[in-house]
UniProtKB/Swiss-Prot annotation:
Residues 22-238 form the tr-type G domain. It catalyses: sulfate + ATP + H(+) = adenosine 5'-phosphosulfate + diphosphate. The gene is cysN. Its EC number is 2.7.7.4. This is Sulfate adenylyltransferase subunit 1. Residues 110-113 are annotated as: G3.
Length: 469
């Protein structure tokens, strides 16, 4: 049995207790096709002894059929789970894997390198604390490297590790690593990525500088990849100042209890704090902070809690509870960045459901400011947005919502776009700011026309009738 299987088999309770309080780091791997992303994750899983023996046996068997390495087994097959991925030797879907060390827990998202799977990479990056961008030492910074760096910046990932892989194929030459480092840092500066970028020379296939320092690169004085992942500071990434609490569920098991359930998006709340409910603007104070393990005196970002208040206020799912002295901005017209994920193009004026945290409303694109070519990063005019394209646009909502910019608060500043007919998620967006023009145009329609329009939109949504004012 493997070390992991032995621990679980002998004392599962102590194993779970040992790991439950460790800090969690979510990270993604991205880079050009065949840069070794899946192999790197396989190496991390293998060297951290997080593979069951039956998994290892299956991988060894599959390696003989579809393996791409000359070794005993292909580490990439630990991650490439889809049959089409194994046959093509590429990653298509976002593959999530979990492992743990003595210091920290990890969730890895292995994202596709191909341009046609940009939406998949955006999905994997949306919850990541850190991104590992792989560069093949033989080829240096490539078009896909630039694309993935742009997406990590777009999605607000604060910590970047550039892993220069396959250094064994260039004999771990220091000058090659230094040249790639210089090229990438120059590009990152042009992109506005100036904080927390670390470069590491590695060989994912052989394990050099992954968990143990390699003797082949005595000139490299920095941390190994694993040591960096275990020690990088992510606590300060959380906003513990501005309290935001999207109400997910109103819990009323009996006449004597009415609690508001959800997960704190940011900030800290204490019993007795003055709060305001948005969009109604009604105020109260916190009576109790209830959890499964008992009541708390205070709670903070990412904790799931139930709040009770000292006053009877009408609150429902989708409302936002904030501290009265720390209120967010509010608007119905927003400047947003959109990643389009549907084969049906995004058209100006077409109405979609817009879901931000627990708030759901209806909205449409008023106009596109520009779209960005993810390969050249050039901006151009746009009338529609096609699959995998990214655009800055003006989003018009049917109701005013409270929001923070995505850069300040990912939960309050992100949303998904849902097709009103199929209920498919067709896009994702990041709120950058409120639009300069918040006024509604003077109506050119009669009261009857406006009421009839509302009736048609309510009972015949498949007609995709646009709202008039």
């Amino acid at each position: 049995m493997s070390d992991l299987e032995n621990k679980i088999a002998t004392d599962i309770e102590s194993y779970l207790k040992e790991h439950e309080n460790k800090q969690l780091l979510r990270f993604i791997t991205c880079g050009s096709v065949d840069d070794g992303k899946s192999t790197l994750i396989g190496r991390l899983l293998h060297d951290s002894k997080m593979i069951f023996e039956d998994q290892l046996a299956a991988i060894k068997k599959d390696s003989k059929k579809v393996g791409t390495t000359e070794g005993e087994f292909d580490l990439a097959l630990l991650v490439d789970g889809l049959q089409s991925e194994r046959e093509q030797g590429i990653t298509i879907d976002v593959a999530y894997r979990y492992f743990t060390t003595d210091k920290r827990k990890f969730i890895i998202a292995d994202t596709p390198g191909h341009e046609q799977y940009t939406r998949n990479m955006a999905t994997g990056a949306s919850t990541a604390d850190l991104a590992i961008i792989l560069i093949d030492a033989r080829y240096g910074v490539q078009t896909q490297t630039r694309r993935h760096s742009f997406i990590t910046k777009l999605l607000g990932i604060k910590h970047i590790v550039v892993a220069v892989n396959k250094m064994d194929l260039v004999d771990f030459k220091e000058d090659i690593f230094n040249q790639i480092s210089s090229d990438y840092l120059k590009f990152a500066q042009e992109l506005g990525m100036t904080k927390d970028i670390t470069l590491i020379p590695i060989s994912a296939l052989n394990g050099d500088n992954i968990v143990k320092r390699s003797e082949k690169s005595p000139w490299y004085k920095g941390d190994t990849l694993m040591n960096l992942l275990e020690t990088i500071k992510i606590d300060e990434d959380r906003d513990l100042v501005h309290f935001r609490f999207p109400v997910q569920y109103v819990n009323r098991p009996n006449l004597n209890f009415r609690g508001f359930c959800g997960t704190i998006a940011s900030g800290v709340i204490k019993v007795g704090d003055a709060i305001t409910v948005l969009p109604s603007g009604k105020s109260s104070t916190v009576k109790e902070i209830v959890t499964y393990d008992g009541n708390l005196d205070y709670a903070y970002s990412q904790q799931a809690i139930t709040l009770t208040l000292n006053d009877e206020i009408d609150i429902s799912r989708g409302d936002i509870i904030v501290k009265s002295d720390e209120q967010p901005d509010h608007a119905s017209n927003l400047d947003v960045d959109i990643v389009w994920m549907s084969e049906e193009p995004l058209i100006k004026g077409k109405q979609y459901f817009i879901k931000r945290a627990t708030t759901v409303t209806v909205g449409s694109i008023d106009h596109f400011y520009y779209k960005t070519d993810v390969n050249t990063l050039e901006q151009s005019e746009a009338n529609v947005l096609n699959l995998n394209e990214i655009s800055r646009a003006k989003l018009d909502l049917e109701q005013v919502i409270a929001f923070d910019s995505y850069d300040k608060n990912k939960v309050m500043g992100s949303f998904i776009i849902i097709d009103r007919i199929t209920n498919n998620t067709v896009g994702a967006g990041m709120i950058r700011n409120k639009s300069e023009d918040q006024s509604k145009k003077d109506s050119i329609y009669s009261d009857f026309e406006i009421e009839f329009n509302a009736l048609v939109r309510k009972h015949f949504p498949h007609w995709e009738c646009k709202e008039i004012f």
